[in-house]
A protein has these predicted regions:
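Short, small/polar residue-rich loop motifs at catalytic or cofactor-binding pockets
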Residues: 155-157
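Short, well-ordered beta-strand elements
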Residues: 167-177
Length: 177
């Protein structure tokens, strides 16, 4: 059998795995008694008026990524990701989501500190809280000026969404190569 990376609940330990999001998606489906697409539409996409955001299906069409000059079409892999990466969006819609996430439009802002239990993960200098990442550079990595911390998430397929609390700055983007 497989051995765990550490005993569950060990202070300061975290291991990033997309399966955590998939499990959360399954729990949401059981509680709400709806499909994931309907849950996203009801609680996130429609309330935030995200016009270019959807849960990918096998028949979905969107821009390919490129490997050198070769386009790679990936709706099958993205549609199979579900809660762990099956959302397709634009940088603009991702910005709306990010600002809403940190301003209390999705849930009370008082819940945010509960997500900030930072643990080191394998991708230094990234740390992981509950569902979100933090990047906090050491002075060794940023010797000329202190780099402010950013919190948010990087996506599996070339997207990122981060918030810099000390500057009240929101950063989103997408890449396809």
């Amino acid at each position: 059998g497989m051995k765990p990376h550490f005993i569950n609940g060990t202070k300061g330990k975290a291991f990033y795995a997309d399966i955590n999001f998939d499990l959360l998606g399954e729990i949401a489906k059981k509680i709400v008694q709806k499909e994931l697409e309907d849950i996203y539409n009801q609680f996130i996409i429609k309330p935030l008026e995200l016009e270019h955001t959807f849960l990918c299906k096998k028949t979905s069409s969107f821009a390919p990524i490129y490997l050198n000059a070769t386009p790679l079409y990936r709706p099958l892999i993205v549609s199979s990701a579900g809660a762990s990466g099956g959302i397709v969006s634009t940088a603009q819609d991702t910005m709306k989501f990010l600002k809403s996430f940190y301003s209390g439009k999705l849930f009370k802002e008082t819940y945010l500190p509960m997500l900030y239990r930072w643990n080191r993960i394998r991708w230094y200098p990234m740390e992981y809280g509950i569902g979100i990442m933090r990047c906090k550079m050491s002075r060794l990595m940023s010797p000329f000026f202190p780099a402010p911390e950013i919190i948010g998430h990087s996506g599996s397929f070339g997207t990122f969404a981060f918030y810099c609390p000390s500057k009240n700055l929101f950063i989103t983007g997408t890449i396809n190569q």
